[in-house]
């Protein structure tokens, strides 16, 4: 009981300080921080608990979207080309070093299209740095696959654990409708070619699919079985204000949305695929640590991307407090798995 009172007292003090200085606008606007009895408003305590949880989070797995540029125009994209900024490589390395010192185990490079900048050489140098210099257990990439060349694997493949290729349909016309294409080039030809290179250069191959209006009734079992990825990540199409929804967005993803029941039906139809890893909207919103091109954590809990200050300016410990990251949900969705190719025991 004494300990509970101490904790309650500390919460009150902390809440009072937050009420005075403000928590980046996270206070409950229009509501008093204290009730008429002098007790802290429950909504304020919730804010405090969220901040405490985020402050104690370890950035074991981080998604670094170092570029927003892309050669595809997927209609539901939630990280669109609002800027062309890319950090100088030495600054990016400094940020990655800060993350490693804070507990980073897995880095995932994404975009935009990560191979678009400097024809993949910038990406390759970061991959090499993370595996060789930082000795991270897992280094991975998410790409649309269209700009990858075998020469890249020859130079950097040994440093990469997992390569995920985004593929939403095994029908070329559907890919064209979605925007998962460049001109009339075959997205599927690239998919199979990259899969073969992954086998040749000993990189674990993964597939990411966004389930939406145009592919929700598709049966992908035969194709996924043939490709045989180590993981098939299946996402429910998600709206993010300012990215693919709202007046300032570069995409209008509303027409791609499906219901929770439609998503569940798709999962049940593909339940025989053992490598399937489903992610609903609920799981996605707060279970990822996302760094943008300025190395700011992005808080997506309110259906938009609220950035922290850059870890390059304030450090990881301070910036992560405004990430919206729920470590429990991260673990619940299976965010921690066998992510080093050295531990996968794959037959190449």
From Swiss-Prot:
Keywords: 4Fe-4S, Antiviral defense, Endoplasmic reticulum, Immunity, Innate immunity, Iron, Iron-sulfur, Membrane, Metal-binding, S-adenosyl-L-methionine. One of its GO terms (cellular component) is endoplasmic reticulum membrane. Residues 56-276 form the Radical SAM core domain. Expressed at low levels in spleen and head kidney. Its main location: endoplasmic reticulum. CDD domains: Radical_SAM. It is a peripheral membrane protein. One of its GO terms (molecular function) is metal ion binding. SUPFAM superfamilies: Radical SAM enzymes. Binds 1 [4Fe-4S] cluster. The cluster is coordinated with 3 cysteines and an exchangeable S-adenosyl-L-methionine. Its cofactor is [4Fe-4S] cluster. [4Fe-4S] cluster binds at residues 70, 74, 77. Induction: By interferon type I, type II and LPS. Induced by infection with viral hemorrhagic septicemia virus (VHSV), presumably through type I interferon pathway. InterPro entries: Aldolase_TIM, Elp3/MiaA/NifB-like_rSAM, RSAD2, RSAD2/Viperin_antiviral, rSAM. Interferon-inducible iron-sulfur (4FE-4S) cluster-binding antiviral protein which plays a major role in the cell antiviral state induced by type I and type II interferon. PANTHER family: RADICAL S-ADENOSYL METHIONINE DOMAIN-CONTAINING PROTEIN 2 (PTHR21339), S-ADENOSYLMETHIONINE-DEPENDENT NUCLEOTIDE DEHYDRATASE RSAD2 (PTHR21339:SF0). Belongs to the radical SAM superfamily. RSAD2 family. This is S-adenosylmethionine-dependent nucleotide dehydratase RSAD2. The lineage of its organism: Eukaryota, Metazoa, Chordata, Craniata, Vertebrata.
